[in-house]
Amino acid sequence: MQITNSHFFSILLFLWAGPTAANNLPWQPITIADYVITSPASVELGKRLFAEPKLSGNNNISCQTCHHPDHGTSDGLSLGLGEGAEGIGPERMANSGIKKRVPRHSPTLFNLGHKSVIEQFWDGRVSFDPKAPSGFDSPAEDWLPKGLSSLTAVQATLPLTAQFEMAGNTGENEVIGAVRQRIDYAWPVVVERIIADDEYWAMLQNTYPDLQNRSQVNITHLANAIGDYINTQFRSFNAPIDAYARGEDMPLTESQKAGMALFYGKAQCDQCHSGALFSDQQYYSLGLPPMGPGRTRQWDPWARDVGRMGVSNQAQDAYAFKVPSLRNLAFTAPYGHNGAYATLEGIIKHHNNPIQALENYDRSQAILPAASKTLEFIDWVGFNDKREMQRIKQSIDIEPLQLSQEEIDQIIAFLDLLNEPDLIARIRDEQ
C-alpha cells in the first residue's frame, strides 16, 4: 500500500511536534452528536429483546448469546455455535443437532450507531440504498420491510432467519419452516411470540404510541428497538485515546509514544485503521488462514469464503473483508473475520508477513469448541486445497512490514489506549 500525501504529512507532524501533542491525531474527538438519535423507551425495549430467546426458532438463543458483554460484545470464539448449542463463550458446547459452525467470527457492536458507519457485516452486505423500496440493500432484497430506522435495525432482522444462527434446522420449528417459503414469512411468526406477552405489549405501546392493537405490530417495531439499544448502549468514545484527542492531561508511557509513532508512521496501521473509529470501512484481503466452512456463495463448490466478492461479484474483492474498528481490542479476542488469531500479537505478526504467516499458521491460535468429526474436518479443509491457498496468497492487499518484536510490543502498548474498561464494566453490570 502506498503512503498518501496526507499520511506523509501526519508523519512529519509527529516528527516535528512529537507524538505526545494531542492535536497531532488526524481525527476529531467523537461527540454524542456523531451518533444516530434514539429514544429511551425504544432503547429499554431493545435491551430486553436483545436478550430474548423467543426471537429464535427453538426459543434457546438470543442476540446476546453471540454478542455478550463478557466477551466484548462478541462471543470469545473464532467461529461460533449458534442455535442448538449450550453455554456462553468458549464454554459453549455443540450437540448432535449442530450441522455447521457459524461461518464468520461474531463481530463486535461498538459504535455501530456512529453516523459514519454506512455498511455492516464483514462483507458489507447491509448498506444504505435510496433506490431500494426499504431504503437499504440486504440479503432480504425487496422482501425487507419499509420502516426500518437504521443499519443496525436492518442487521437485527437477518440472524432471526439464518438456519445456523437463530432459526434452527429445517423441520424443527415454524420459523425455519416459514423461512424456507420466503424470508419475510418468518418475521410475523417471531412477532406473534412477542405480542402474546402482555408485558411486551405494554412496552411496545409505550415505545410506539400510535399502536392501537397488537395486530399492528410488525418486525420493524422490534428491529428498530434492538437497533436503538445497540446504537446507544455500545457507544465507545471515552477511552484514554479520546481524552488525549480532546487535549486532556493524558501522560503516555514511552512504549505508547513509540507505538503511536509506529501506528501513524512506519507500520502504516492508519492506512486502513483511520479516523476516530480506527477503520476506513473499506475491504482488504489480509490472506488470513481459510479456517471453517466459510460463507460460501450459492453455487460455490468449495467450502470457502471469498468475502466482499460474494456481495459485489467483483473479482478484485476476492477474500477481502471489512476493516474492523480497533476499539476495545483487549476485550474482543480472537481477531480476524474468522477469529483465526487468539492474540493481538498473532494478528499483528500476520500483518508483518502475511504469506509466511499463512503458510506457517499455528492452528492452536483458533478458539473452536469441540464438535463432530465432520465439523472439525471442515474447519481445516481449506488448507488441503493448494489452488485455493494460492488464490488467497495472490489476493493479499498488504505488504510485509518487517517490524521487530519490540516494535510489535510498542504497537500493542499504544492499542491499549483504545480500550475503555469502564464501558465494559458498565455493560456487564447492566446485562
What are these regions (language model features)?
Residues 1-9:
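Bacterial N-terminal signal peptides that target proteins for export
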Residues 16-19:
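N-terminal signal peptide c-region/cleavage motif recognized by signal peptidases
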